[in-house]
């Protein structure tokens, strides 16, 4: 099954981070979109998994590769796609 998981990173979305995330979305990465403000960044990650827990674990691994040390974010409920 394929899921979308929303991940919130407690980091402001500045110009440099916006440019970085735009290039991440264009790469072979699983981040499909993002938005944010001064309070945090919300990324939508497309992942595969057999269940909700697998989807969240996959999202954690994906975000850890993009923002090392930032896996303390909040993860939304996976949605089947």
PLM features: what roles do these ranges have?
Residues 1-81:
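Long, contiguous binding/interaction regions
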């Amino acid at each position: 099954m394929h899921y979308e998981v929303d991940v919130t990173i407690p980091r402001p979305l500045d110009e440099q981070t916006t440019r970085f995330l735009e290039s991440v979305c264009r790469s072979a990465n699983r981040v499909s979109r993002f938005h944010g403000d001064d309070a945090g960044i919300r990324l939508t990650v497309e992942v595969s998994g057999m269940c909700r827990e697998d989807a969240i674990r996959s999202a954690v691994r994906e975000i850890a590769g993009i923002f090392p040390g930032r896996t303390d974010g909040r993860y939304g409920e996976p949605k089947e796609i």
